[in-house]
């Protein structure tokens, strides 16, 4: 009986040719696993293609709701970003995929897990560290670090040689990653920084100049930091993301052209479409500015950056990530309320906030006197607050 390998399968170029390559070079029984995080593929087609390519079995795991609740909601609550711009659409999906791969490897008693990540990318780290953190005995096969195929053009040629149908041409080659949260585009003419990216590549977003000519008003209701209602309507987690992707996309919201520092050392360029995430982060940030005290709000910004770094680097299965989640959950206890946004041709304008947990008090914040604040109190405060500056000036006078 042949030993088994669990292959992270998408039906795309790389994983399509890996199946015959594994059988040819390792003589393994290939178990394909497609983790459905909302990439929008025809899963019946993916199943058929995996079997036709030589897999003995194909699992399709629909984890969209788990992806939103256990991963994306953590992103929203923490407002995690990598290098201030990247909303981590790929990064948040990878640990969930690694989790499912390990679960199925255990079920199938497979000794190997294989992925189609390139030897220059971050995903190889995310998958492999994720697997090792759950089961250090599983062996990894990473074809892009082993085989003679050195480019996507070579991969297309090999696909033709082994009879695997791949809907990619050499004339227009982009590496695309899609899920509920985002679409990323890399490679091809994007690798030349002198090239403006082409707007016809967009899947989710209408180019801002072609977006609706009238503004759209949007209300998002959060409960303890998580979105639960859109325009007054309760929706399930997946439908919330889908609806906001539609609303944001038709208003030209959520495009980012980013140069990022990869974990493996080089810089790379990516075009990201994240309409729902962009709307949710903007609304959540506004609500937090009203409901969090100054020091928690400021410290959380530091934690958010650290959280984004951890997720980007594939360190999901760590004590620090769990500890940050616990801290973030504590900060979200009063992040409940409705934020109204005005959307127009790629721009987001927060219009209003309605929450019973507001730390903003109109009476105190106005220029008039109040029971809690006297203008006369300011003089003593300024004298004490500025004392170090005054002492230094006196010494140097």
From Swiss-Prot:
Record's keyword annotation contains Nucleotide-binding: yes
UniProt-recorded Gene Ontology molecular function terms: argininosuccinate synthase activity; ATP binding
Catalytic activity: L-citrulline + L-aspartate + ATP = 2-(N(omega)-L-arginino)succinate + AMP + diphosphate + H(+)
EC class: ligase
E.C. numbers: 6.3.4.5
UniProt-listed GO biological process terms: argininosuccinate metabolic process; L-arginine biosynthetic process; urea cycle
Positions bound to L-aspartate: 118, 122-123
Residues reported to bind L-citrulline: 86, 91, 122, 126, 175, 184, 260, 272
One Pfam family named in its UniProt record: Arginosuc_synth
CDD domains: ASS
Pathway connected to this protein: Amino-acid biosynthesis; L-arginine biosynthesis; L-arginine from L-ornithine and carbamoyl phosphate: step 2/3
GO CC term, one of those recorded: cytoplasm
Residue positions binding ATP: 8-16, 116
Keyword vocabulary terms for this entry: Amino-acid biosynthesis, Arginine biosynthesis, ATP-binding, Cytoplasm, Ligase, Nucleotide-binding
Protein localization: Cytoplasm
Family: Belongs to the argininosuccinate synthase family. Type 1 subfamily.
Quaternary assembly: Homotetramer.
Name the record gives this protein: Argininosuccinate synthase
Gene name tied to this protein: argG
């Amino acid at each position: 009986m042949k030993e088994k390998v669990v292959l992270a399968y998408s039906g795309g170029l790389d994983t399509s040719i890996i199946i015959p390559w594994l059988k040819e070079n390792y003589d393994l029984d290939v178990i394909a696993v497609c983790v459905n995080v909302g990439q929008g593929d025809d899963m019946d087609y993916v199943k058929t293609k995996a079997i036709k390519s030589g897999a003995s079995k194909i699992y399709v795991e629909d984890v969209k709701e788990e992806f939103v609740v256990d991963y994306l909601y953590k992103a929203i609550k923490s407002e995690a970003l990598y290098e201030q711009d990247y909303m981590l659409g790929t990064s948040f999906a990878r640990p969930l995929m690694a989790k499912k791969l390990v679960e199925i490897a255990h079920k199938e008693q497979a000794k190997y897990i294989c992925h189609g990540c390139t030897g220059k990318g971050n995903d190889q780290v995310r998958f492999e560290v994720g697997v090792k953190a759950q089961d250090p005995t599983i062996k990894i096969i990473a074809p892009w670090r082993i085989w003679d195929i050195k480019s996507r053009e070579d991969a297309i040629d090999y696909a033709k040689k082994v009879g695997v149908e791949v809907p990619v041409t050499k004339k227009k080659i982009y590496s695309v990653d899609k899920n509920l949260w985002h679409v990323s585009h890399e490679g091809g003419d994007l690798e030349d920084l002198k090239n403006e990216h082409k707007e016809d590549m967009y899947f989710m977003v209408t180019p801002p100049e072609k977006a609706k000519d009238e503004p759209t008003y949007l209300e998002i209701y959060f409960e303890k930091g998580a979105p639960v209602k859109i325009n007054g309507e309760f929706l399930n987690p997946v439908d919330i993301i889908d609806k906001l992707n539609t609303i944001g996309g038709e208003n030209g919201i959520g495009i980012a052209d980013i140069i990022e520092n990869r974990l493996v050392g080089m810089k790379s360029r990516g075009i990201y479409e994240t309409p729902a995430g962009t709307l949710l982060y903007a609304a959540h940030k506004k609500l937090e500015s009203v409901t969090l005290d100054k020091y928690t709000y400021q410290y959380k910004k530091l934690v958010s950056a650290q959280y984004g770094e951890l997720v980007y680097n594939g360190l999901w299965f760590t004590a620090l990530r769990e500890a940050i989640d616990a801290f973030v959950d504590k900060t979200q206890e009063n992040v409940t309320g409705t934020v109204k946004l005005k959307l127009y041709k790629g721009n987001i304008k927060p219009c209003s906030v309605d929450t019973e947990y507001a730390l903003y008090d109109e009476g105190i914040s106005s220029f008039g006197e109040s029971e809690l604040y006297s203008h006369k109190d300011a003089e003593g405060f300024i004298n004490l607050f500025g004392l170090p500056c005054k002492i230094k000036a006196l010494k140097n006078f």
